[in-house]
Regions:
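Short beta-strand-to-loop acidic/aromatic patch adjacent to the donor-nucleotide binding site
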Residues: 83-95
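N-proximal low-complexity "stem/linker" segments adjacent to membrane-targeting elements
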Residues: 1-21
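Short, acidic, metal-binding catalytic loop of nucleotide-sugar glycosyltransferases
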Residues: 20-29
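A conserved acidic beta->alpha catalytic loop
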Residues: 12, 21, 35-44, 63
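Glycine-rich, basic loop-to-helix element that forms the pyrophosphate-binding segment
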Residues: 61-81
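Conserved donor NDP-sugar-binding/catalytic core segment of glycosyltransferases
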Residues: 95-133, 138
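A recurrent flexible, glycine/aromatic-enriched loop bordering the glycosyltransferase active site
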Residues: 155-169, 182-203
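A short, conserved alpha-helix in the catalytic core of glycosyltransferases
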Residues: 186-187, 194-213, 218-243
Length: 306
């Protein structure tokens, strides 16, 4: 069986479309919807809608816990109630048009056993292939550098420029293409040791057996996958990207409902990202403080052969 954990917030039609796409997939599956305390009552509406559906479970979480803790509620439920070979954690604004998505996951695992697996993620907003996010995991230095850059973007003028980019698919696409070219990311080839995009990530049973709540809980939103990748590197877990499986990502649906103003939305992203970067720095510093003297840091796994 393959479990699907969908984090729901406000956008009920988007969640329904996600569920519909999963139900159309070949293979044995169970869908778990975690409602992150949607203030518009859509969590309760989904619970009533799927009450008689044996293939769907709706969990009404009592508070909006953000991405990491909200998804952890779902993965913990899967580990407790289901015998799932794989657990797919995906945003409610993701759809899976690939009919053999589930059999392909099993095929990939048989050939290349993994702890985490990421599909090719195509942004419907910009057309960009979003995964892998980067070829290199975060370090203390990179976290501090990114935090300084993000903090500068709180400048009102830079905030307006950033908001304009994100409001225009054409401009955002050009910015993302430029950034990804700098990193030499080839989304057409399988890879290991890369940072996956968090809108859709697949956990193997062996990984969730060790970490039933896989996401670092001291974040609300953003930078979760960089932190998860760092944790995986510390214990030598296998993180794989494989473009033979693919999903579509309809971005910004829930945040657009929450924040009609693109400037307010951008400020929310910046504030959350700064909090997550603070959490990442504290985690890395705590790890370094606990390392035995003379211990060598874990290196990032090299790009895998196709």
């Amino acid at each position: 069986m393959t479990a699907f954990v969908i984090l729901h917030y406000r956008a009920i039609d988007t969640t329904r479309s996600c569920v519909k796409s999963i139900r159309a997939l070949a293979g044995d599956k169970h869908i778990v919807i975690v409602d992150n305390a949607s203030p518009n009552g859509t969590g309760a509406a989904l619970a009533e809608e799927f009450a008689a559906s044996p293939d769907v479970t709706v969990l009404l979480h009592g508070k909006n816990d953000g991405f990491a803790r909200g998804n952890n509620v779902g993965t913990r439920w899967v580990c407790t109630h289901l015998d799932a070979d794989f657990t797919v954690v995906l945003n409610n604004d993701v759809e899976i048009p690939q009919h053999d998505f589930i059999p392909q996951i099993a095929r990939i695992y048989a050939q290349h056993p993994f702890d985490l697996l990421g599909p090719d993620i195509v942004s419907v907003f910009s057309g960009i292939h979003q995964s892998p996010k980067t070829l290199h995991g975060c370090t203390l230095e990179s976290v501090r550098h990114k935090r300084a850059c993000v903090a500068r973007s709180k400048n009102p003028i830079l905030l307006l420029l950033s908001s304009g980019e994100k409001n225009s698919p054409a401009i955002w696409r050009l910015v993302q293409i430029r950034n990804r070219k700098k990193q030499h990311i080839d989304t057409t080839q399988p890879a290991e040791g890369v940072v996956l995009h968090g809108s859709c990530v697949i956990f193997s049973q062996r990984y969730l057996a060790r970490h039933p709540e896989p996401f670092y809980p001291k974040t609300f939103m953003y930078y979760e996958m960089e932190i998860l990748d760092w944790l995986c590197r510390q214990e030598g877990s296998v993180v794989r990207y494989d473009p033979s499986i693919s999903v579509l990502h309809y971005q910004y649906v829930a945040s657009k409902m929450e924040y009609r103003s693109i400037v307010r939305r951008s400020k929310f992203v910046i504030d959350c990202l700064l909090d997550s970067l603070d959490a990442a720095e504290a985690l890395i510093l705590a790890s370094e403080a606990s390392e035995p003297e003379g211990a060598q840091p874990v290196n990032t796994i090299a790009l895998a052969d196709a």
